[in-house]
Amino acid sequence: MCIRDRDGANVEISEQVGMDNIYIFGMRSDTVLDMYRERNYNPMTIFETNQELRLALTQMIDGTVLPDAPSALQDLYHSLLIGDWGNMADPFFVLKDFGSYSMAQRRIDADYADRDKWNRMAVINTAMAGVFCSDRTIREYNDTIWHLDPLKRKV
């Protein structure tokens, strides 16, 4: 099953399989652009108010995730909450999307428990995936961009 954010390719996938057969999470692109423009995003607020997220991030640096190298994820932790090298904290809004992602994951867990529903969704996703195969994509690129003649070879 697909759990996807709201970027362009994922929108195309959802159009193929139907919104009932995909899990979408996260902000819309216009909201992301507004947040960049307004520069009022503070991931520390999310960290302080979301217990699930706070636990996950804390476990990144307290030895829970990597007991043999507890400081290995320190830079990531710091970049998500404070920023690094003069850059804004969490520039890809990972923490902002965390709540939405968690809700999508809970929907996945519930749907997985319903075997008939899960199997139907799996068949639909598999059947509708053909449009995204690389052969079709390359043919389309060639037809619309490259305009190359196919190579012929004896087999």
Which residues make up each language-model segment?
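Conserved small/polar residues in nucleotide/adenosyl-binding loops
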Residues: 1-5
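Phosphate/diphosphate-binding loops
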Residues: 8-9
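Extracytoplasmic/periplasm-facing segments of secreted or lipoprotein envelope proteins
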Residues: 18
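C-terminal amphipathic helix plus adjacent low-complexity
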Residues: 22-155
